[in-house]
């Protein structure tokens, strides 16, 4: 299984049978090396409804007839727009043909600004625990620090965790060090930073502070084999 990072919170997972993208914010994400028009994927996972996470979901899903998994209210909205979306809620898990998804708690907001300017309620934000062939990826989503992250680390043997460090909209670097320690993943990767001036951070400096497992600031487009 190959896992790659593409700026902001965009993560791709590729197995022998499936191509999965999480929070595909491509256009408007200057760090991203992907092209929404040509991206090939059959599964899209969304942590919440903010535009910098839903991103190019509509274009990608329509081009690929992709299957979407998202928090309940967001999934219902996407389904109403003609997309193939499966709703889940916090604490729920489900086994799909591509792997098992469990939604975890996240402390954040969730709304989508449509093209006409209307604001769509997106339900509760989430983190995503994705387990495939015995390997577990934890995309923490956008969140503040909260102590249940330690519980998730105790309950699950996490191979790689993607943790926001940008501050202002999510936890900052100091809190994210605590999060990495509690989650206790083999590899902790910083995300949600340097996309906008207000979330500029030194990812390598953050990674060097991680004492539990390995902190690692992935380069854009870099691939890790799990």
Swiss-Prot record:
A Pfam family that this protein carries is Lactamase_B_2
Sorted UniProt keywords: Hydrolase
One annotated GO molecular function:
hydrolase activity
NCBIfam families in the record: PRK00685.1
- Similarity section: Belongs to the UPF0173 family.
Please identify the protein, giving its name as recorded: UPF0173 metal-dependent hydrolase OB2186
């Amino acid at each position: 299984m190959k896992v790659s990072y593409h700026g902001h919170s965009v993560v791709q997972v590729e197995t022998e049978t499936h191509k999965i993208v999480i929070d595909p914010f491509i256009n408007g994400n200057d760090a991203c090396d992907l092209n929404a028009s040509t991206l090939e994927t059959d599964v899209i996972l969304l942590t919440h409804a903010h535009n910098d996470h839903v991103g190019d979901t509509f274009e990608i899903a329509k081009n690929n007839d992709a299957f979407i998994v998202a928090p309940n209210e967001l999934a219902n909205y996407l389904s109403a727009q003609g997309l193939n979306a499966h709703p889940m809620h916090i604490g729920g898990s489900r086994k799909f043909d591509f792997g098992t998804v469990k939604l975890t708690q996240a402390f954040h907001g969730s709304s989508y600004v449509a093209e006409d300017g209307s604001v769509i309620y997106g339900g509760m934000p989430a983190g995503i625990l994705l387990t495939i062939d015995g390997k577990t990826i934890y995309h923490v989503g956008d969140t503040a620090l909260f102590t249940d992250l330690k519980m998730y680390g105790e309950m699950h043997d996490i191979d790689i965790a993607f943790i926001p460090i940008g501050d202002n909209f999510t936890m900052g670097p100091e809190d994210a060090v605590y999060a990495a320690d509690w989650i206790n993943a083999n590899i902790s990767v910083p995300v949600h930073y340097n996309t906008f001036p207000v979330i500029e951070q030194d990812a390598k400096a953050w990674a060097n502070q991680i004492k539990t497992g390995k902190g690692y600031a992935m380069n854009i487009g870099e691939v890790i084999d799990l």
